[in-house]
Amino acid sequence: MSNAPLQLQNICKNYGALRVTDDVSLNIEAGELHAIIGPNGAGKTTLIHQISGHAQSDSGRIIFDGQDVSRLPMAERARMGLVRSFQITSILPRFSALENVAIAVQARSGSSFSFFGNASKEPALNDAAMALLSRFGLAARAGVPAGQMSHGEKRQLEIAIALAAKPKLLLLDEPLAGTSHDESQRLINTLQELRKELPIVLIEHDMDAVFALADRVSVLVYGRIIASGSPQSIRDNAEVRAAYLGEEAA
């Protein structure tokens, strides 16, 4: 029996007559950053939805931290430490960066956040939120409304919010999407540090980032995994080149 923190066992998802993920089996090992790549419409985001509980699988099993979480709702999986970011930034734009993170920190503690209060009035909350912002180079932007931050800053903020939940495994859905070159590089540096602390599942279209970061890469095409292995083995795989990467990746 595998000791992998996350095990996907023959999971499928249908939308009407369309099978979006098809018999996907995959283990995410402790200490690895595992990238999932594939063309648009391959089922990558649906797969993340299934893992996180945002969408229920129609069949198959999802084992997380030794427990079958296949039928658990998203909030319960998050409480267990299976935490995701969203492909579309899900921050509170009118609240400051500090307040966004503070809300997440307080939610982790099980208490409600006062939307009319100020995070700085709660020293422990403030300190925890500022520590996360500092880690992402956002301390100087703590008081800025999140809606006024650059796209790259929002993506960093979103990961900081996810980390406030103290995840055991982090699911990241295209964190580099829409970022500038400099913003992308900062995020890559951040992920290089994060991967030392916890396993990460990364959905990403930026192949340079994928091959720089990933320990293993799985390729999803038409809802099925056609290859899984080291970045170099994926580069060298003729079926992958034909289906997705293109011959120029050879």
Label for each model-derived stretch:
Residues S2-A250:
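Glycine-rich phosphate-binding loops of nucleotide-dependent enzymes
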